[in-house]
Amino acid sequence: MADSSFDVVSKVDRQEVDNALHQAEKELNTRYDFRGTGAKIEWSGEDKIVLTAEAEERVKAALEVFKEKLIRRDISLKAFDAGEPVASGKTYKITGTLVQGIDAEHAKKISKKIRDEGPKGVKAQIQGDELRVSSKKRDDLQAVIALLKSEDFGIALQFVNYR
């Protein structure tokens, strides 16, 4: 019998993030406490989001609105890395980045966790920005998924291609 396997990835559905951004933008335009503050949220390039407002507390509040919308769209906050408010002229700006892919450091941590605490006979291989986990028994793979879900690696993990 062939080995069963699945991939551990860290990807974000950009369309869902775009929907969350538009919902947050709509709320910023209609909420009374954001009137006249110049609060805006917009894309900057492929994976950066910029929030601007005329006061530091308003830009932080706009960030909270955006995070709330991300949660509602089932996007992990670990996938969005927001910076600190930066004063630029009369406005304050927060630049956030969408974090995608598992870097080598996190992949090694995850692989070590599987080797140390996972069931015997489970193999983890690093393949670029994802991790392939394989085993002869599907039950062992389920145990590995449960193990990885219980641990916090600081990035959003998804489990795909379960065969």
UniProtKB/Swiss-Prot annotation:
It comes from the Bacteria. Signal peptide: none annotated. Keywords: Nucleotide-binding. GO terms for molecular function: nucleotide binding. InterPro entries: DUF520, UPF0234-like_C, UPF0234_N, YajQ-like_sf. One of its GO terms (cellular component) is cytosol. Nucleotide-binding protein. NCBIfam families: PRK05412.1 (NF003819). Belongs to the YajQ family. This is Nucleotide-binding protein NFA_51200. It comes from Nocardia farcinica (strain IFM 10152). The lineage of its organism: Bacteria, Bacillati, Actinomycetota, Actinomycetes, Mycobacteriales.
